[in-house]
Amino acid sequence: MDLTGLLLDEEGTFSLAGFQDFTFLPGHQKLSARIRRRLYYGWDWEADCSLEELSSPVADIAVELLQKAAPSPIRRLQKKYVAHVSREACISPCAMMLALVYIERLRHRNPDYLQHVSSSDLFLISMMVASKYLYDEGEEEEVFNDEWGAAGGVAVPTLNALERGFLSAMDWHLYTDPREIFEVLSWLESCVAEQQGRRRGWYTYTDLCVLLEQPTWQLALGSLCQRLVKLSCLLAVAYVSSVALAVASVAVIHQSLGLSCTPTPGPPDLGLTSRCLLEPCIPSVPQCLPSPANVSSCLEGSTGLRSLWGSLLASLTPPPLPPPDPPAPPTPFHNCHLCQKLQRDSPTCHACHHPNRTAPTALSSPWYHTYGLAPPWPWSPVPASIPQPQQCSLFSIMELARLKSFIFPG
């Protein structure tokens, strides 16, 4: 059996049955899927006319483009007319893109023709010529001029005259390279994605993929990424610099405090602390710290003194005392060497007859030792002749409480 027997049917004629579903182009299914997804045609595979009429976003783009190309106010193109013609004449998206190629050629080659034709007639005749170019005679998709006239509401003689004028303006140059079709398809996809995203207020992943394929969007995104990277680098440098400056400041302050308040080698000077605490009671003790600020700075510099101060201040809360006697009128202290010599023997000086208010009266109960005067060690600067301190006056207790609240506020 030869090839002729395979192609001819029983009646001896060549039948095209079964060839309509045959895919000649390898990328036909891929192109159809791309058009359905990016031009908002949907995925209704069971519908026969899913790709035989323009989608709503594509119709909007066609109306906007043709109104700008043919600005004549006569028979101005409307979306309702586009939808009706595309549904009645079964306009495919490929015919729509080819018609856009023809209109772009007219804008460059014969712009005077576009000034005299209406936008509705331009849409109808461009779609008809594009469909005739794509679907040759004998195809099922073939639509005659009378059907086009009925779909567009134009008489057949008028439609024939419009077709001859369009072909003359095109100089019968209808051939189109496939690359031009794909360029128009890419432009149409970007217009549809941008328009629909602005209308909704947000973009789908498909819209973003379409927009990022455009050179202008790639340049804009690249410049935005560069600015974000520069801003991130500046913020990182500023953060690292601030952290380094803070660490350096803390180190310098710690070192300066450590150098200014580092105690000398040797046993701790417990007598100095005792003398500072009991200064209101024992005015004859020399070399007391001048202010609580110096005491607090030394506490931060020495760990041993901090622990000592903690133990001392923990024991500074005495038991409740009986109500004190009415205070006597203050008597100025006299710088009498006999008072300083005899303050441990008698509260009254026999030479100047002035009372010594800070001298201890007698040894009392053991809880008076909580005021922290250490025993006279051999290396202590406190003289061994000074006995353990006794209960101080109300003025000294107030001073100690004020010192405690200053060192540990709250």
Swiss-Prot record:
It comes from the Eukaryota. It is a single-pass membrane protein. The chain crosses the membrane at residues 233-253. Keywords: Membrane, Transmembrane, Transmembrane helix. It is found in: Membrane. GO terms for cellular component: cyclin-dependent protein kinase holoenzyme complex; membrane; nucleus. This is Protein CNPPD1. One of its GO terms (molecular function) is cyclin-dependent protein serine/threonine kinase regulator activity. The keyword Membrane applies. Pfam families: Cyclin. Belongs to the CNPPD1 family. It comes from Pongo abelii (Sumatran orangutan). The gene is CNPPD1.
